[in-house]
Amino acid sequence: MSINKIFEESWKNRLTKYEIARIISARALQLAMGASPLIDTNNLPFNDVISIAEEELKRGVLPITVRRVYPNGKIELVSVKKVEFK
């Protein structure tokens, strides 16, 4: 089994820490620029844009897709809605 295949299988439904940081920062920027939150923010302990973006990501409500390009040229699209969080 090739190393690319092992990587694809182990990260299929997970995000790297870099992908998570990029998604949260992009969504926090959208919220800071006036976008409406996709969740009810009244029950959150903190009401800043980063906390809201993190919670939206954890709940799986963000309509974002991550595009991964592998060294062999294969492209994989990972929907944030289908990602598992521990």
UniProtKB/Swiss-Prot annotation:
Q: Per its database record, what is this protein's job? A: DNA-dependent RNA polymerase (RNAP) catalyzes the transcription of DNA into RNA using the four ribonucleoside triphosphates as substrates.
Q: What is this protein called?
A: DNA-directed RNA polymerase subunit Rpo6
EC number(s) on file = 2.7.7.6
Q: Is Translocase one of the keywords UniProt gives this record?
A: no
Pfam families on file: RNA_pol_Rpb6
Can you cite an annotated GO cellular component? cytoplasm
* Chief site of localization: cytoplasm
Location in or out of the cell = Cytoplasm
Main EC class of this protein?
A: transferase
Keywords of the record: Cytoplasm, DNA-directed RNA polymerase, Nucleotidyltransferase, Transcription, Transferase
Catalysed transformations (reactions): RNA(n) + a ribonucleoside 5'-triphosphate = RNA(n+1) + diphosphate
Gene Ontology molecular function: DNA binding; DNA-directed RNA polymerase activity
Q: Which GO terms describe its biological process?
A: transcription by RNA polymerase I; transcription by RNA polymerase II; tRNA transcription by RNA polymerase III
The species this protein belongs to is Sulfurisphaera tokodaii (strain DSM 16993 / JCM 10545 / NBRC 100140 / 7)
What family is this? Belongs to the archaeal Rpo6/eukaryotic RPB6 RNA polymerase subunit family.
